[in-house]
Amino acid sequence: MAQFYSAKRRTTTRQIITVSVNDLDSFGQGVARHNGKTLFIPGLLPQENAEVTVTEDKKQYARAKVVRRLSDSPERETPRCPHFGVCGGCQQQHASVDLQQRSKSAALARLMKHEVSEVIADVPWGYRRRARLSLNYLPKTQQLQMGFRKAGSSDIVDVKQCPILVPQLEALLPKVRACLGSLQAMRHLGHVELVQATSGTLMILRHTAPLSSADREKLECFSHSEGLDLYLAPDSEILETVSGEMPWYDSNGLRLTFSPRDFIQVNAGVNQKMVARALEWLDVEPEDRVLDLFCGMGNFTLPLATQAASVVGVEGVPALVEKGQQNARLNGLQNVTFYHENLEEDVTKQPWAKNGFDKVLLDPARAGAAGVMQQIIKLEPIRIVYVSCNPATLARDSEALLKAGYTIARLAMLDMFPHTGHLESMVLFSRVK
């Protein structure tokens, strides 16, 4: 009788190698060389030696993890957050702020093939004025998890503190946890958002089943005792205001109202400096006509209108156009108009563009602005400021302007998200005479 044996599972022992790290990439990974190949190692810093094992081996590069660190960089710091290394929110708390800024600036300079002229930064801790915390009910313990996703996973890190949040929001975390953990609807909660506006603190609760009257009463009592504006979201389309007025924030001396679900820059300090520097770079004169593309609800548009003869803001989301118009009225600005347009189409043929523009500002999403670069070139502005949240699409879009005779006059790294791998930037293009 034939007998069949299952093959023994092959076991491979990963080789331990010793490496010296010579660089830090913009994502906070140590960069070393081994056998002529670039090696990326999370958790290591320049000037550090370590024993590592290779976890992924590609043709051009490899990834490794630390087995034992043999030396420490003088720029290594003790992370402030007890969740660092598990939570996916921050990647660089182990590095000095100066090293973080240098590595991001170097990465930006390489992509843009141009020197970074300045870093626009603010406080490195307590800067984040918005947080979205995932909620998950654990049947075994009958407890509610509240926190951020683990690095590279959909699992939740139960967050007790978060030092990058503005102090008002960090102080709220245990109170929000206790309130939500006492609700009958604990099993049917999706996430909670906390927003710190100039007007006050907002709490937006996403729930997937109707709330009982007892739960609603608990939430209302909590919002009143903590001085919160409370919003309930039974689905992705509906937002019910339970308490509070229209929120607003200050932007360079102006008051901008927004809906709790509207995008606002999470770093208020860097946003203020970024807007001020953009106006300075554009060198706005009282007789200038200025165009603001991807304008949102007027973060740049309205401050521009305080200096220019006229400003046109163009946006693809109708609700944001309406909000921009409302903010212009609230601030008594009559020289600014907002238009809803598909920015993939040629907007230079619109009636509002017939007189051209002296200066142009654009602040697109991560996908960049490939569809509008030729339109901007047609308008022949003297100066262009491009604000970017994705250096790769910025580099791609810049090529069109450089080929059309523009040059990079200034390049800034925006340290909008300290301790993370996010890299934002701003470029001034000038037309060659």
From Swiss-Prot:
Active site per the UniProt annotation: C389
EC id: 2.1.1.190
Binding site for S-adenosyl-L-methionine: Q265, F294, N299, E315, N342, D363
Biological process terms in GO annotation: rRNA base methylation
Domain of life: Bacteria
Swiss-Prot/TrEMBL catalytic activity: uridine(1939) in 23S rRNA + S-adenosyl-L-methionine = 5-methyluridine(1939) in 23S rRNA + S-adenosyl-L-homocysteine + H(+)
TRAM domain residues: 10-68
Its biological purpose: Catalyzes the formation of 5-methyl-uridine at position 1939 (m5U1939) in 23S rRNA.
HAMAP family: 23SrRNA_methyltr_RlmD
Name used for this protein in its record: 23S rRNA (uracil(1939)-C(5))-methyltransferase RlmD
Organism: Escherichia coli O6:H1 (strain CFT073 / ATCC 700928 / UPEC)
Lineage of producing organism: Bacteria, Pseudomonadati, Pseudomonadota, Gammaproteobacteria, Enterobacterales
